[in-house]
């Protein structure tokens, strides 16, 4: 899987939009047969998506046709301004982006409130296939360059 270590997503807004050109990955990850349809892997930072630890690696598959987005699934969405990991719901000419962390402020408002992403502002969408988190190891991680 091409791994773009200089590209990250956060569970909020990330202004580090970088190139995920398949011809220029930072490294290659040998994931065996875990994610055979993966087209990219990037790091996730933040706490708005509780299923992904900050610093974990997301295995992704690029979605070329926005009409095939599955409501309620997790995606990495990249615009010219930011890259985020969110659950998506189709809402006409935009997607509603939801966090799975339902934490609230003292007044009851969500800290990670849903927001709208215009479809015509989206450069790339990737379906999250899975996540790899290293908690502890004294062994080497298999990475090919």
Region locations from a protein language model:
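Short, positionally conserved secondary-structure boundary motifs
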Residues: 1-54, 63-67, 121, 131-145
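Amphipathic alpha-helical interface segments
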Residues: 96, 101-145
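Structural motif
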Residues: 53-57, 73
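Short, compositionally biased
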Residues: 49, 70-83, 91-93
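Short, mixed charged/polar active-site loops
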Residues: 83-85, 112
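Residue-level recognition of conserved beta-strand edge/terminus positions
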Residues: 60-62, 78
């Amino acid at each position: 899987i091409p791994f773009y270590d200089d590209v990250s997503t956060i569970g909020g807004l990330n202004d580090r939009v970088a190139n995920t050109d398949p011809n220029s990955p930072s490294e290659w990850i040998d994931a065996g047969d875990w994610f055979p349809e993966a087209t990219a892997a990037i790091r996730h930072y933040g706490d708005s998506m509780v299923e992904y630890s900050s610093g974990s690696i997301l295995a992704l598959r690029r979605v070329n046709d926005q009409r095939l987005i599955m409501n309620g699934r997790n995606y990495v969405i990249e615009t010219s301004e930011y890259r985020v990991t969110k659950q998506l719901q189709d809402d006409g000419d935009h997607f509603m982006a939801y966090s799975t962390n339902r934490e609230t402020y003292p007044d009851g408002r969500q800290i990670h409130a849903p927001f709208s992403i215009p479809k015509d502002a989206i450069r790339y969408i990737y379906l999250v296939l899975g996540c790899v988190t290293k908690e502890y190891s004294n062994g080497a991680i298999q990475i090919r360059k």
